[in-house]
Amino acid sequence: MRSNYIVIEGLEGAGKTTARQLVVETLQSAGIHDMVFTREPGGTILAEKLRSLVLDIQSTGDEVINDKAEVLMFYAARVQLVETVIKPALARGQWVIGDRHDLSTQAYQGGGRGIDRTMLATLRDAVLGDFRPNLTLYLDVTPEVGLQRARARGELDRIEQESMNFFNRTRARYLELAAADPSIRTVDATQPLDAVARDIRATIAQWMAEQAA
């Protein structure tokens, strides 16, 4: 099977790290071992600096980051990662497993922030063209459950400290986007871990069978 780009998405506390391991195990059981792992924002020297700038609550002192400036920083980090890491890895025949990609911006900034969706789509198309993940696993969790898990991990970053209404809007946009795109598969991440693991493995296996057909 040719190389593919698989992305794991979801709110804070959805279980993306655990899901990544399950995806890896499922791929390995199918004989796929050459994988590259990415995260957004981040994954290159420049992108990691932008990550610190946009997520660290201390990064800009008392200066509030403008919503549109936030979007542009996310896209700057994303383009750098796609062009210098993801595309070259795919060209080498490696599989890429990503923690977040463009769906996060469409959900968090388009849903949570309320930024004009046409503008976001235009910007995405301008800088990414038709580049898209082959498969996106969206781990659906309520903000209440997700933030409770996130708080248990420790200090929250700048976006994790947003209001419950922000995360409700973000989740609603995630669900809307997932319903409209067959390359996005939704997993109920509020279930017990063994049930989530079962669903992730089944989703990956089904998708791989579809690709082989």
Curated annotation (Swiss-Prot):
Binding-site residues for ATP, renumbered to this chain: G10, L11, E12, G13, A14, G15, K16, T17
Keywords: ATP-binding, Kinase, Nucleotide biosynthesis, Nucleotide-binding, Transferase
Disulfide bonds: none
The keyword ATP-binding is assigned to this record: yes
PROSITE patterns registered for this protein in UniProt: THYMIDYLATE_KINASE
Superkingdom field: Bacteria
A GO molecular-function annotation: ATP binding
Record-level GO cellular component terms: cytosol
InterPro entries: P-loop_NTPase (IPR027417), Thymidylate_kin-like_dom (IPR039430), Thymidylate_kin_CS (IPR018095), Thymidylate_kinase (IPR018094)
UniProt-listed GO biological process terms: dTDP biosynthetic process; dTTP biosynthetic process; dUDP biosynthetic process
EC number: 2.7.4.9
Catalytic activity: dTMP + ATP = dTDP + ADP
Family assignment from sequence similarity: Belongs to the thymidylate kinase family.
Role played: Phosphorylation of dTMP to form dTDP in both de novo and salvage pathways of dTTP synthesis.
Protein name as annotated: Thymidylate kinase
